[in-house]
């Protein structure tokens, strides 16, 4: 493919034809890519590690996974990038992989150079630029036997973290705990999750894969060609952003127009400073270590595009996004983007402010049935309060609070957002209606649960006991209330005890 076809000069409603005749891999190219893959794979399985010790041990190839565009089903014609992930028995942990990867890559390189004549292809081992970090792959340039094109293949030795992979199940959260605690360079261990990355893309409809091809072609011809020396966001980052645009703009439908989808992606790239994208398909907020890590990740500077398979891999942190936005803005003025219709992704970004997904909020109030609403984690909490007040027909001052597992109950300020409190997933909130001069106090039960109560600041502790009993709490016989470690008498006055708004009082059983 010496001369790349002109996307910008193609009318939007002709993009299907353009893709089919210019970008779809042709049979001869696919067959040659397949043959090269099979020969290299056979070399690793049957020759590379046979009859020789590596790291003082016999090394076995546990499995070989095809990644990259070819593995995901989004390759371009005569532009093939194949990732061959070698899961090796010599790696028993992420830390061991980090320590021994260079030795393994050097060994593979020497064996390939020694045996490349037997592979029936002209193979060149590309030299990586010297840098602070050890390369995680070995790049091969394989000369096509039927054209002047080059098949690029990255060989990535990896730790088999997933074990027996099941595409329909979430990995055990302990796998991600180990990944996070390893504290490696962000995304450095992503090859261990290549099967998840591949399935995340490969399982999508054919029409979406065609849109992915179109976006990747744009990245190749108009970004990489124009900004050859710049560090640009990866193709994988653009793939994930395209999938997000499709999910939001079509509600994951396979019935859409390519030009509308392409325009939606360009608009997202133009507004990259609003992007915060993540999925909970393979990891979520249930595990404490993972939850705390994700909260910190999602508080970072935009754009944020978390790898759905590897939470340490924020694909938005790397590359000159301003150059991408500049080219996307120019692209939107070209023939390929002249379309009468638009996807609703921009509206979604206004609704899912800053491009983040809505949080499911379960609203609870004593004496009333709980209910659920969706809200944006970056939207002011005062807007959330207004929705609750209207839905529940409340007329007093609305006080809302939440409690992390094992933590103290915290009031939610209307001047802040849920994201300010690190809330990006499902959350239960307690609603309390107060009338001046009432304050809100929290009572902590022995099991760790905190409940809010509205009470006059001049009321006695006995009045608070009455409210606790009305709420279904224990009676005073076998229990005491403590504040800052001191037992409270029934006749004590809250104001005299200097108990202020949002203070916590401990409920404790008499020993």
From Swiss-Prot:
* Regulation of this protein's activity per its record: Produced as a latent enzyme which is activated by dsRNA generated during the course of viral infection. The dsRNA activator must be at least 15 nucleotides long, and no modification of the 2'-hydroxyl group is tolerated. ssRNA or dsDNA do not act as activators.
What reaction gets catalysed by this protein? 3 ATP = 5'-triphosphoadenylyl-(2'->5')-adenylyl-(2'->5')-adenosine + 2 diphosphate
The record, for SMART domains, names: UBQ (SM00213)
Task: Look up the domain of life of the source.
Answer: Eukaryota
Q: Where does Mg(2+) bind?
A: 81, 83, 154
User: Which GO MF term does the entry hold, naming one?
Assistant: ATP binding
Q: PROSITE patterns, from UniProt?
A: 25A_SYNTH_1 (PS00832), 25A_SYNTH_2 (PS00833), 25A_SYNTH_3 (PS50152), UBIQUITIN_2 (PS50053)
> Could you name the Gene Ontology cellular component terms for this entry?
cytosol; membrane; nucleoplasm
- EC id: 2.7.7.84
Q: What does this protein do?
A: Interferon-induced, dsRNA-activated antiviral enzyme which plays a critical role in cellular innate antiviral response. Synthesizes oligomers of 2'-5'-oligoadenylates (2-5A) from ATP which then bind to the inactive monomeric form of ribonuclease L (RNase L) leading to its dimerization and subsequent activation. Activation of RNase L leads to degradation of cellular as well as viral RNA, resulting in the inhibition of protein synthesis, thus terminating viral replication.
- The name under which this protein is listed is 2'-5'-oligoadenylate synthase-like protein 2
Gene this chain is encoded by: Oasl2
